[in-house]
A protein has these predicted regions:
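N-terminal pre-ligand scaffold of iron-sulfur
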Residues: 2-92, 125-140
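Cys/His-enriched microdomains
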Residues: 79, 96-99
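Short Cys/His-rich "knuckle" micro-motifs
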Residues: 88-93, 108-112
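Short, Lys/Arg-rich amphipathic alpha-helical interaction segments
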Residues: 99-140
Length: 140
């Protein structure tokens, strides 16, 4: 499998600046009982295939990256590279992978397996479920 790298400049990589933004509407999600509930109507970032958003802070126990993938499914990851520094991840369009925003470009498949870079282990993935106009991410 050939690895595709996101087009990021050296400063973005050195400072670990992710390409994926926080939600335009900070109220698009709620967290309760180990579940994140995302309202699709308030999360336009997830409307298009390849779209993604990062959720962090606001009482969440960990950072989460949510991706609307090319295969028609949604995926959620602990948004933390397993390499030194624990930088954030970004989806790589058309590849079924997410990649660390740092200089090492550690890359993982949607099942969390490492396929490129120095980390020794996988990233944590979370079960997701579409329930009407909501996406539920199970952190437990």
């Amino acid at each position: 499998m050939a690895i595709k790298f996101l087009n990021r400049n050296i400063f973005q990589r050195i400072f670990g600046l992710p390409a994926t933004s926080k939600p335009l509407d900070p109220q698009c999600s709620t967290f309760s009982d180990g579940k994140i509930m995302i309202d699709f109507k308030r999360a336009p970032e997830l409307e298009k295939v390849g779209g993604a958003l990062r959720l962090e802070g606001d009482g969440l126990p960990r950072r989460v990256l949510v991706v609307n993938a090319d295969d028609g499914k949604f995926y959620a990851f602990h948004n933390r590279c397993t390499h030194i520094g624990h930088r954030r991840l970004d989806p790589v369009p058309g590849t079924g992978t997410v990649q660390c925003c740092s200089v090492n470009k550690s890359t993982y498949t949607y099942d969390g397996s490492k396929i490129y870079g120095p980390p020794t282990g996988p990233i944590k993935t979370f079960k997701v479920e579409v329930a009407g106009e909501r996406l539920i991410v199970f952190l437990g």
